[in-house]
């Protein structure tokens, strides 16, 4: 299933600071604030919240307890044998330079030298750094070294480099590696490596399980390296603590009825997680809403956005008939994020989803309530 971009834990502090800074700006004399949006959380809210898990870890709970709380009815299991994932790092219309490779396209290479992956029609050619052809590689160039490959302008990565021509005629730059090594490059980008080991281990198991169930089926790759899948930045982003969390849980995944569980997670739930069905329309027994008491540690556990009447009507223009008069929330989820609402405009009534409202307003989540207040001078906080 293709999921929307998901904010990371590290993005929270920056966004919260920006919101406060914007609120401190002087308002235009013409702007009259008369709508206040009160909200909770950051992201879709399905599955484990990083800040909630952090709080449980601070209160002495182990990673198995944390996972069991957020993914109801699952159990810990172990994958058998090596599992390889393929992660799209970037796409390039130019040649891809790389080094530290000892072989590519059935050709022995010097790891101290730089080589190129060059597109020729729908195939890839291995070339020297000077552009001299070395070998025709067919549909995919695969370059491997002694455990690490250096891709110019991208970074150092465990495993191998694979380049594949995509539908747009560009080269997909893909990192193929074991799922355990992949998780080492994910954990510190989804949870601060200074957090307690129990939270990092919970993140390791959740990230490993997610990686093995959330393949997107792209041109030569399974996963994105950003929030469309999980944030993955390779070897240079690794930390000792997060590596330890991966190694001490190596191969562990969450299971449900004999299958690896699809362990969605988000940064901040707002105090209650949400069910998969209410957010993505698919019912999954272990992805249901649960209380998240320690999410209060999150900078965006609660937030407020303020809009003038003209401003909110402009933002909702594609959903609203006329100028906004009233918002009626008609259906909510467990959390309670908005599932459905009615917008009363001067030209009529329209029905929208919470996700439509979130996108239109640029809010942090779809857990929102709307308050119409007396007009006064103020600035938009978003």
PLM features per residue range, with description:
Residues 2-382:
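Conserved, single-site charged/polar hotspot
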């Amino acid at each position: 299933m293709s999921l929307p971009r998901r904010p990371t834990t590290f993005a929270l502090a920056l966004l919260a600071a920006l919101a406060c800074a914007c609120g401190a700006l002087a308002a235009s004399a013409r702007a009259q604030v008369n709508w206040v949006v009160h909200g909770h959380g950051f992201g879709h809210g399905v599955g484990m919240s990083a800040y909630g898990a952090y709080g449980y870890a601070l209160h002495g709970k182990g990673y198995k307890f944390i996972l069991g709380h957020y993914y109801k009815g699952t159990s810990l299991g172990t994958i058998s044998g090596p599992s390889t994932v393929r992660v799209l790092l970037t796409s390039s219309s130019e040649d891809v330079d790389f080094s530290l490779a000892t072989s590519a396209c059935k050709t022995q290479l010097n790891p101290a030298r730089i080589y190129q992956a060059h597109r020729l029609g729908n195939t890839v050619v291995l070339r020297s750094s000077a552009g001299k052809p070395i070998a025709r590689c067919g549909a995919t160039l695969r370059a491997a070294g002694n455990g690490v490959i250096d891709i110019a302008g991208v970074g150092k990565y465990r495993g191998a480099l694979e380049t594949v021509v995509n539908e747009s005629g560009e080269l997909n730059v893909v990192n193929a590696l074991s799922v355990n090594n992949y998780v080492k490059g994910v954990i510190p980008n989804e949870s601060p490596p200074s957090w307690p080991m129990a939270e990092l281990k919970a993140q390791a198991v959740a990230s490993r399980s997610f990686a093995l169930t959330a393949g997107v089926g792209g041109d030569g790759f399974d996963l994105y390296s950003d929030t469309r899948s999980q944030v993955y930045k390779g070897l240079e982003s690794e930390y000792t603590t997060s590596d330890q969390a991966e190694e001490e849980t190596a191969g562990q995944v969450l299971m449900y009825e004999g299958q690896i569980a699809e362990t969605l997670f988000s940064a901040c739930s707002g105090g209650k997680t949400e069910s998969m069905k209410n957010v993505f329309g698919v019912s999954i027994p272990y992805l249901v809403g649960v209380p998240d008491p320690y999410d209060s540690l999150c900078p965006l556990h609660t937030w407020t956005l303020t809009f003038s009447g003209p401003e909110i009507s402009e933002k909702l223009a594609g959903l609203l008939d006329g100028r906004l008069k009233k918002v009626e929330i008609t259906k909510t989820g467990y959390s309670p994020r908005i599932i459905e609402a009615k917008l009363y405009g001067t030209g009529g009534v329209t029905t929208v989803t919470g996700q439509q409202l979130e996108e239109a307003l640029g809010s942090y989540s779809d857990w929102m309530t709307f308050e119409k207040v007396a007009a006064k001078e103020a600035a938009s906080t978003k």
